[in-house]
């Protein structure tokens, strides 16, 4: 970036010196004026860009990435965001990546050797600092393929950590602890269970068993911070069918409220949203797509929303929990802050 600034600055200096020689060449002068305007615009963008020092300020004792809805074979914003995640990781030092579903669009994967594992994942997230544990959940697009292959890929890749369809993972360091509870949301939603030709594995999963597990896991959790992650939202602004959220509100939300979890985070909607619900202390978070986003507008309960693509950085200390929305330029466009 320093080289870019220097080069642009040199151009502007040279332009000012040679400009008098173009007084009679109106077309060239106009071109130079346009080019100067462009250079000034680029310099303004560079001035607004986030630096490694800015990224370092986002961190806590424990730090994590969360990304989702990225499986586009590297197209759209997937590759640039993956490269950004790698550069930022040098400063943020995340413990892991929480992958909140739809790593693979559009029909999931057929097997552990499906080429999509390379084009959607391995070859895209190839930065050395992304060679760390990834903890995924299944999204609706994974449910269009072979969901067991997504679990079995843990036997192929050393960084793919998926012991079950739903599971939890605790981290602790220097007196700070956080538990991520990762749930399998597609089988909780009626329309996926009923569309057996399109989502063949959804109806085979027990809703009751998963809800009992969720309740008992949260009952036993003693960490400073509890973050529940699923692919589908409980509350969100979206054009998707309302029954998806109604099913999540009926099945999942009462358990989360009972145990007063800190954050419920999801993907699926392809934009950034932070919502609160009356009578609940939970921060409901929609993490944007790390490839291709959609428009969004505020609704009742909206604290923030943005159509930007990107990912999130979660940072925890003993007294605070922050979730930062990061856009594709590396800028923290919004922060959800919780304190004790």
Regions found by a protein language model. Give the residues of each.
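Residue-level marker for buried hydrophobic side chains located in beta-strands
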Residues: 64-66, 97-99, 136, 228, ...
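Generic beta-strand structural signal
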Residues: 66, 99, 277, 316-318, ...
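C-terminal structured domain segments across diverse proteins
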Residues: 233-234, 269
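Bacterial Sec-dependent N-terminal signal peptides
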Residues: 1, 5-50
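Residue-level signal for glycine
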Residues: 330-332
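Extended active-site neighborhood of metal-dependent phosphoesterases/phosphodiesterases
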Residues: 58, 105-226, 241-247, 251-263, ...
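Active-site flanking residues adjacent to catalytic metal/cofactor-binding acidic residues
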Residues: 68-69, 101-102, 183, 230, ...
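N-terminal active-site segment of His-dependent metallophosphoesterases
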Residues: 47-115, 208-209
């Amino acid at each position: 970036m320093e080289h870019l600034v220097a080069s642009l600055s040199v151009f502007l200096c040279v332009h000012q010196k040679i400009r008098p020689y173009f007084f009679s060449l109106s077309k060239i002068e106009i071109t130079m004026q346009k080019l100067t305007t462009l250079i000034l615009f680029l310099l303004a963008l560079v001035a607004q860009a986030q630096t490694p020092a800015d990224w370092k300020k986002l961190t806590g004792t424990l730090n994590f990435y969360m990304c989702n809805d990225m499986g586009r074979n590297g197209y759209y914003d997937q590759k640039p965001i993956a490269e950004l995640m790698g550069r930022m990781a040098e400063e943020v030092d995340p413990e892991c990546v929480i992958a909140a579903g739809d790593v693979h669009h559009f029909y999931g994967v057929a097997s552990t050797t499906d080429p999509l594992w390379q084009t959607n994942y391995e070859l895209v997230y190839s930065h050395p600092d992304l060679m760390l544990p990834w903890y995924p959940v299944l999204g609706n697009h994974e449910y269009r393929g072979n969901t067991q292959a997504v679990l079995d890929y843990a036997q192929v890749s050393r960084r793919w950590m998926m012991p079950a369809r739903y599971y939890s993972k605790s981290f602790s360091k220097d007196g700070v602890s956080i538990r991520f509870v990762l749930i399998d949301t597609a089988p909780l939603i009626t329309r996926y269970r009923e569309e057996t030709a399109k989502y063949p594995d959804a109806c085979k999963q027990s809703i009751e068993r998963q809800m009992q597990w969720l309740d008992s896991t949260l009952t036993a959790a003693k960490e400073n911070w509890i973050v529940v992650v699923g692919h589908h939202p409980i509350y969100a602004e979206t054009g998707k069918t309302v029954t998806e959220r109604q099913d999540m509100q009926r099945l999942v939300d009462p358990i989360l409220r009972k145990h007063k979890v800190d954050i419920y985070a999801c993907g699926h909607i392809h934009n950034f949203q932070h919502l609160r619900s009356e009578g609940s202390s939970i921060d409901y978070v929609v993490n944007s797509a790390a490839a291709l986003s959609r428009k969004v507008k505020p609704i009742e309960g909206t604290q923030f929303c943005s159509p930007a693509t990107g990912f999130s950085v979660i940072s925890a200390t003993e007294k605070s929990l922050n979730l930062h929305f990061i856009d594709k330029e590396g800028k923290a466009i919004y922060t959800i802050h919780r304190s004790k």
